[in-house]
Amino acid sequence: MVQQLSLFGSIGDDGYDLLISTLTTISGNPPLLYNSLCTVWKPNPSYDVENVNSRNQLVEPNRIKLSKEVPFSYLIDETMMDKPLNFRILKSFTNDKIPLNYAMTRNILHNTVPQVTNFNSTNEDQNNSKHTEDTVNESRNSDDIIDVDMDASPAPSNESCSPWSLQISDIPAAGNNRSVSMQTIAETIILSSAGKNSSVSSLMNGLGYVFEFQYLTIGVKFFMKHGLILELQKIWQIEEAGNSQITSGGFLLKAYINVSRGTDIDRINYTETALMNLKKELQGYIELSVPDRQSMDSRVAHGNILI
């Protein structure tokens, strides 16, 4: 369990390249491309559960978020085949269109490998050409983040994905004078589940939870001093009726630091200072602010929100 201190901001699509250069200069580190498929689960409404704890205190039921990385081969189409998988590829995701669909995510949840065709059409000559070009670029600019590359798996499979991460979060701390958002988060890793035809879906159903909604995040991360992490991301809500990009026309920026102990006041104050220094450094370019705490409330009584 950690205390996560954070600030949020946004930029338009046209400011992406400049922000990448700025954050690279500030952090001294290259951006790392990542993705995360997030599924949100709520208590099964057909179960009658007493919402009280061992002290007979009323406890509101919370949602649980499960997230994992999926192979990038599930996320790119034919128009991106010849592009290296680095931070530049994010500029190609400008609309709602994305190969990952509702049926594929259902297969992932039920531990079935989704059927993808985009990488099957890639020939070996194209791969060799791309790697040769990347090698030349890397040798020419060994310290330049522009040439940082990350290859997707040529043979996508569900088994190659990272394990599921299970997260439960509290509503951020209240207070009108807070300079940063502070939220308690408990997280663990699901390495495996037992039983016949086991899957994360059957595991959650066994715990008394049912699927509610899901979304996909694709972005880049910067690792900075003082344990500060910056995420620049695009978000899609994935529904049976189709996908929709929530961040259409721009990017969401999240700056956060995790503090391992909520009672470590000195560390919390130090972390808050680090975030405020970043806010001051980016002032006039990006306005980092504290979001509405209701938008980060995972309690079931507060509607379908992204957490």
Swiss-Prot record:
It comes from the Eukaryota. Changing residue 22 to I: In SRB5-1; suppresses the phenotypic defects of an RNA polymerase II CTD truncation. Keywords: Activator, Nucleus, Transcription, Transcription regulation. One of its GO terms (molecular function) is RNA polymerase II core promoter sequence-specific DNA binding. The keyword Nucleotide-binding does not apply. Pfam families: Med18 (PF09637). Its main location: nucleus. One of its GO terms (cellular component) is mediator complex. It is found in: Nucleus. GO terms for biological process: cellular response to heat; positive regulation of transcription by RNA polymerase II; positive regulation of transcription elongation by RNA polymerase II; positive regulation of transcription initiation by RNA polymerase II; RNA polymerase II preinitiation complex assembly; termination of RNA polymerase II transcription; transcription open complex formation at RNA polymerase II promoter. Residues 117-162 are annotated as: Disordered. Coiled coil: none annotated. Component of the Mediator complex, which is composed of at least 21 subunits that form three structurally distinct submodules. The Mediator head module contains MED6, MED8, MED11, SRB4/MED17, SRB5/MED18, ROX3/MED19, SRB2/MED20 and SRB6/MED22, the middle module contains MED1, MED4, NUT1/MED5, MED7, CSE2/MED9, NUT2/MED10, SRB7/MED21 and SOH1/MED31, and the tail module contains MED2, PGD1/MED3, RGR1/MED14, GAL11/MED15 and SIN4/MED16. The head and the middle modules interact directly with RNA polymerase II, whereas the elongated tail module interacts with gene-specific regulatory proteins. Belongs to the Mediator complex subunit 18 family. Component of the Mediator complex, a coactivator involved in the regulated transcription of nearly all RNA polymerase II-dependent genes. Mediator functions as a bridge to convey information from gene-specific regulatory proteins to the basal RNA polymerase II transcription machinery. The Mediator complex, having a compact conformation in its free form, is recruited to promoters by direct interactions with regulatory proteins and serves for the assembly of a functional preinitiation complex with RNA polymerase II and the general transcription factors. This is Mediator of RNA polymerase II transcription subunit 18. It comes from Saccharomyces cerevisiae (strain ATCC 204508 / S288c).
